[in-house]
């Protein structure tokens, strides 16, 4: 797969282009030149990512080649069955979910799903769920509780869809109900931010016993552009807003909002998805084993205490 380079990666793009040119020449005696350029490109990528800012991290989190929910589901789970619809209005394809097995154990999974091409982006509403998407997730949550199945959620959305129709059909109610149900669901819930975690649209499937986050994911109450538009009346201030919001994985972990940060390959998950899947598989198994060692009462008490801990000054 040919990598799409972000604006701040252009120096790496130029070096990689030179490597490709030399490969295309296919001449003897240039192997050392190719190796030298490859080492230089890697060092340049390391230099860039060693001092990545919050706004640059946002761009990595939004990278169009980044693995999406269905990529994780297909890589981590077996016997995957997709369930559709909220049994009330429609099937919102911005949220997908269903049943599967993880290491042979039946589970319920759900997550936001963005599109790869224009047609799919429109079909999935750019990963912005409507109320029926959250009600589909609610249906799956209740199914999980009924059959005592652990839940895995994958978070990757700019936010809930703010359209008039969505508001008319109860967007805020759908999100609020999911928060209430997930806070008291009598099965283990493991949530993972794999890309963007946009406000209530992310939180609606983000209440659980563990919050994992990929190294170059972001999680915030509002997008940097939205914040900049409100505070400075200028979306061009998004970079400053991103730094101010504290949206990166390490910073959120430091505040006690994220339990574990999953390291990504140099340059982001899209450069080596298999490495990310392998790490996720290992950490999912670890956390699930810990949670399943608790009885239901202990599980719910721990979750309640965890939620009440959020926002307490000095708690982290």
UniProtKB/Swiss-Prot annotation:
Cellular component GO terms held in the UniProt record: acetyl-CoA carboxylase complex
Gene3D superfamilies to which the protein is assigned, alphabetical: 2-enoyl-CoA Hydratase, Chain A, domain 1
Domain of life: Bacteria
Subcellular location: Cytoplasm
Disulfide bonding pattern of the chain: none
Entry EC no(s): 2.1.3.15
Catalytic activity: N(6)-carboxybiotinyl-L-lysyl-[protein] + acetyl-CoA = N(6)-biotinyl-L-lysyl-[protein] + malonyl-CoA
Domain CoA carboxyltransferase C-terminal, first and last residues per copy: 40-290
InterPro entries the record matches: Acetyl_CoA_COase_a_su (IPR001095), ClpP/crotonase-like_dom_sf (IPR029045), COA_CT_C (IPR011763)
Pathway membership: Lipid metabolism; malonyl-CoA biosynthesis; malonyl-CoA from acetyl-CoA: step 1/1
Protein purpose: Component of the acetyl coenzyme A carboxylase (ACC) complex. First, biotin carboxylase catalyzes the carboxylation of biotin on its carrier protein (BCCP) and then the CO(2) group is transferred by the carboxyltransferase to acetyl-CoA to form malonyl-CoA.
NCBIfam families linked to this entry: accA (TIGR00513), AccA_sub (NF041504), PRK05724.1 (NF004344)
Family: Belongs to the AccA family.
Protein name, per record: Acetyl-coenzyme A carboxylase carboxyl transferase subunit alpha
Source organism of the structure: Acidithiobacillus ferrooxidans (strain ATCC 23270 / DSM 14882 / CIP 104768 / NCIMB 8455) (Ferrobacillus ferrooxidans (strain ATCC 23270))
Top-level taxonomy: Bacteria, Pseudomonadati, Pseudomonadota, Acidithiobacillia, Acidithiobacillales
